[in-house]
From Swiss-Prot:
Protein's job: Required for a late step of 50S ribosomal subunit assembly. Has GTPase activity. Binds to the 23S rRNA.
Keyword Hydrolase: yes
Protein name: Probable ribosome biogenesis GTPase A
Family listed: Belongs to the TRAFAC class YlqF/YawG GTPase family. MTG1 subfamily.
Length: 271
């Protein structure tokens, strides 16, 4: 099996992310709580402690989406789900929010306030499913959604029930990544744009990771990444105009299919 190293450093922190950092910091005192959306394949890695620190004393629902692609572990602090659940997921989210805010509602009721409207921010890294979740809760395609990182650019408020208003926020990435393994895993969960990191580095890391933890999920055998890609290209009949094997396309397809869950359920949080 290949051992994988790379000297590449990821630095992806667009201007709108800094703006969102500043917005959330200012809004924190006026918000009643947050829904933190993470990727079920890497629920810890796709949290952003720089953002959640603003809401330390607020009720927080952590929702791990794409659970159908993940090898999940029991964790009572996380609600696991998939957007394919539709109304079932909506009911689970609303029920969980009602439970989280029951104590607050009791306090307000004791003060004679019978109508409660709570303002929540939906936070998370790029492309973890925040806008899609709000669309589901609103029962309509209200917010701009695309399967790539960095689509939502501004904040907007939406009523999802008589009690709760939600604001989607642009996905906010770490200001810095010191461990390249973390960066590659975030590419493989589609949090980081693939263009930010050399594709061959991502593919090589993915091959090494699957070889170590999930060898049964690799679509083809290979003693190293080079042999694996050759077998991949031959099996898929990936040829260039010169009739040579298109190794670059093989790498691209391998990474894309892994991101989209074609090979089976997994976790990207194994050592």
């Amino acid at each position: 099996m290949d051992t994988f190293t790379s000297a590449v450093k990821i630095n992806w922190f667009p201007g709108h992310m800094k703006k969102t950092h500043d917005q959330l910091k200012k809004l924190a005192s006026s918000l009643d709580g947050v829904i933190e959306v993470v990727d079920a394949r890497a629920p810890t890695l796709t949290q952003n402690p720089e953002i959640t620190a603003y809401f330390t004393n607020k009720p927080k629902l952590t929702l791990a989406l794409k659970a159908d692609l993940a090898q999940t572990v029991a964790n009572s602090n996380i609600l696991w789900g998939t957007l394919k659940q539709g109304l079932q997921l909506k009911r689970l989210v609303i029920k969980k929010l009602q439970t989280l805010f029951q104590a607050k509602k009791n306090q307000l009721k004791a003060k004679g306030l019978l109508v409660h409207q709570f303002r929540l921010a939906v936070i998370g890294m790029p492309n973890v499913g925040k806008s899609s979740l709000i669309n589901l809760l609103l029962n309509k395609n209200h917010l701009q959604v695309a399967n790539r990182a960095g689509v939502t650019k501004s904040m907007s408020w939406n009523q999802i029930s008589s009690e709760f208003y939600l604001s989607d926020t642009p996905g906010v990435f770490f200001k810095r990544i010191d461990e390249m393994a973390v960066g590659y895993k975030l590419v493989l969960t589609n949090v980081i744009k693939r263009e930010v990191v050399p594709l061959e580095d991502v593919g090589a890391f993915a091959f090494c990771y699957l070889s170590k933890h999930y060898p049964q999920l690799l679509p083809y055998e290979g003693t190293d990444f080079t042999e694996f890609l050759h077998k991949f290209a031959i099996s898929r009949k990936l040829l260039q105009k010169s009739n040579q094997l298109n190794i670059n396309l093989a790498c691209e397809l391998f990474v894309s299919e892994l991101i989209n869950g074609k090979y089976g359920k997994l976790s990207f949080e194994l050592d």
